Amino acid sequence: MSLLTEVETYVLSIVPSGPLKAEIAQRLEDVFAGKNTDLEALMEWLKTRPILSPLTKGILGFVFTLTVPSERGLQRRRFVQNALNGNGDPNNMDRAVKLYRKLKREITFHGAKEIALSYSAGALASCMGLIYNRMGAVTTEVAFGLVCATCEQIADSQHRSHRQMVATTNPLIRHENRMVLASTTAKAMEQMAGSSEQAAEAMEIASQARQMVQAMRAIGTHPSSSAGLKDDLLENLQTYQKRMGVQMQRFK
C-alpha cells in the first residue's frame, strides 16, 4: 500500500458515511494525484462543509496544506488552528511539545506513527497544530504518520461507541437505529438511481420506504416493527441493479 493510499484510508475512516464522504474522497484523490492545486479554494470549500466536526475539518485542512504546493506566505486558516489547539488544555500542549521533539528525530512514516500512537488524540491534535502554525518542522512523511495515528485513535473510539450501540439490548434504540439505516439506504438508492429511464422503480421503492419510516415515527410503532426493513430495501436495490447489469453484493 502506498503512503498516500494509507493516508487516504485513515483520514476517510473518521468521516461520517454519506454523500459528503464521497465528495471528500474525490478531493483527496485529486489532491494526491496533483490535480487540485488551488489550496485557498480547497480550504474555503472545506470550511463551509456541514456535518464534519471541527477536529475532522482541522485534520483534513492539515492534510491539504501538507500536500498542495502553495506560496510560502499563504495565511494559515483560523478554523484549522482552532481545531488543532488540543481544546486549549495546557497538558495537551506539554505532551505535544514532548512528542514533537521525538518526531523531529524520526524520518519514516511508520516510525512516526508508532511513536504517536502512545499519545492521546488531544496531544496529537496539538502537535499537528504546532506543525501547522510553523512552530515546528518535520518531514512530510513524519507529519503523515502523525495524521494517521490521530485518525486511528479517533476511529477506535468511534468504533467502540458504534459497537456499544449495535450491541445494546434496548429495543427502542435498536428500533430507531433500524429506521435510520433504512432511511439512509433509501437516500442512497435515490442517488444511485440517477436519471435513467429504468430508475423510476428504484425511486418509487426508496420513496415508499422513507414515507413508511416517517409514518412509523409519527404514530409510534412497536419496536419490532422495523425488523428487516433495511434488508428488504437492499434486496430491492440488488434486484434493480441486476436488471441494470450492475453486480454489487457488498451492501449487506
Curated annotation (Swiss-Prot):
Matches recorded under SUPFAM superfamilies: Influenza virus matrix protein M1
Family annotation (InterPro entries): Flu_matrix_M1, Flu_matrix_M1_C, Flu_matrix_M1_N, Flu_matrix_M1_N_sub1, Flu_matrix_M1_N_sub2, INFV_M1
Membrane topology according to the record: Peripheral membrane protein
One GO MF term: RNA binding
Motif Nuclear localization signal per record, residues: 101-105
Residue segments, region RNP-binding: 165-252
GO CC annotation, single: virion membrane
Residue ranges of the region described as Membrane-binding: 1-164
Localization annotation: Virion membrane; Host nucleus
Keyword annotations of the record: Host nucleus, Membrane, RNA-binding, Viral matrix protein, Virion
Chief localization: virion
GO terms under biological process: viral budding from plasma membrane
Note: Most abundant protein in virion. When expressed alone can form virus-like particles in transfected cells.
Family that this chain belongs to: Belongs to the influenza viruses Matrix protein M1 family.
Function per UniProt: Plays critical roles in virus replication, from virus entry and uncoating to assembly and budding of the virus particle. M1 binding to ribonucleocapsids (RNPs) in nucleus seems to inhibit viral transcription. Interaction of viral NEP with M1-RNP is thought to promote nuclear export of the complex, which is targeted to the virion assembly site at the apical plasma membrane in polarized epithelial cells. Interactions with NA and HA may bring M1, a non-raft-associated protein, into lipid rafts. Forms a continuous shell on the inner side of the lipid bilayer in virion, where it binds the RNP.
Subunit structure: Homodimer and homomultimer. Interacts with NEP. Binds ribonucleocapsid by both interacting with genomic RNA and NP protein. May interact with HA and NA. Cannot bind NP without genomic RNA.
Name of this chain's protein: Matrix protein 1
